[in-house]
Amino acid sequence: MSPNVDDGERLHRRSFVFDLHIHGPGFVPQPFRSVWRGLTVGAPAEVGFDALRKGGVDAAVAKAVGDPIVTRWYLGRSPWDAVEAQLARIERQASDAGALVVGSVDGLAEARAQGTPAIVLGVEGADAIGRDVDHVDAWHERGVRVIVLVHLRDNVLGTTCLPWQRYVGPLPVRRHAAAGLRPLGLRVVERMTRLGILVDVAHADRATLLAVVDAATAPVVSSHTGARALQDFPRYLADDELRAIASTGGVVGLWPYRYRHAGVRHITELIAHARHIADTIGPEHLAVGTDMNGVPGVMAGFGDETDLPKLTAALLDGGFSDREVNGILGANALRVLRKVEEHAHRRPHR
């Protein structure tokens, strides 16, 4: 056993552990959820938010999915209403697990002081906004504090790095527009920044990501990704993309994804990604995004949040200091949310 296992456990319990990207169980409605689970038999079993407490996780961003890969299965509902149904479900699940839904950094601190896991609401795939930028305000009023602009298909805001067909296999994909951030996407980014909603470019292609960063006046994140220098997987980021996100003061989340031949096979490979990213942009720009309940597969030895203490020990084994690991586990992400909040408060609201 690694000598850092006990040290990792102690450090994990002392740290503010913040997962930037999870989903609530059952976000795909039945009977379609059973079909999805049948197609992804290697995926870990879905778990409830009680796994956060068991895994020593203080907070997580739980995201509804706003693109048609999920919303189309909410039969008889508009994409907007499908997202609302998911957000309401997350709130019920949080309540059932004894977690608090919060909308500010102060709320995160209050939840931790009470010894209660905190849930921050998010949306992955802003397709449901349609062409109405004021929908961003409605989501903010609803409590949403993180939005992933694009998900598994291009939308009216920008373009994705990996359409859903490419996860399934070499299927044809019709791209309807040139890659990059659309004018409407720019307006959405500006509105999010003004309101204090964190911009998440996970799933964005290179052109969209760089355009978002170019327009950014507050930190930008990619909540679940890896280093493309280590594997040529479209969901991973090239070094200049990593540097672009770091230039905003943002973070990139370590992602335990493994499906078919893509992603990390085991925790040693995940630490290699952490090491490369830290060497490229500094450990202060690293975070964690497990994608709990949202991935078709994960690395060996990892099932859900209860396995996160293994990551803490492995980071120590990988040469990261206690302070650096504390940052990766959550302090860096907390810093980003605080800066996004402060930036919004400094801006005059029209």
Residue spans for each PLM region:
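The start of beta-strands in P-loop NTPase/AAA+ ATPase cores
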Residues: 16, 195, 218-219, 286
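A short linear boundary/processing microfeature
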Residues: 215-218, 343
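N-terminal hydrophobic targeting/anchoring segments and the immediately downstream early-domain regions
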Residues: 1-174, 228, 232-288, 292-350
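Short hydrophobic/aromatic-enriched beta-strand-loop microsegments
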Residues: 219-225
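Loop-centered beta-sheet repeat module
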Residues: 172-213
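Short gly/pro-enriched beta-turn/loop segments at secondary-structure junctions
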Residues: 199, 215, 245-247
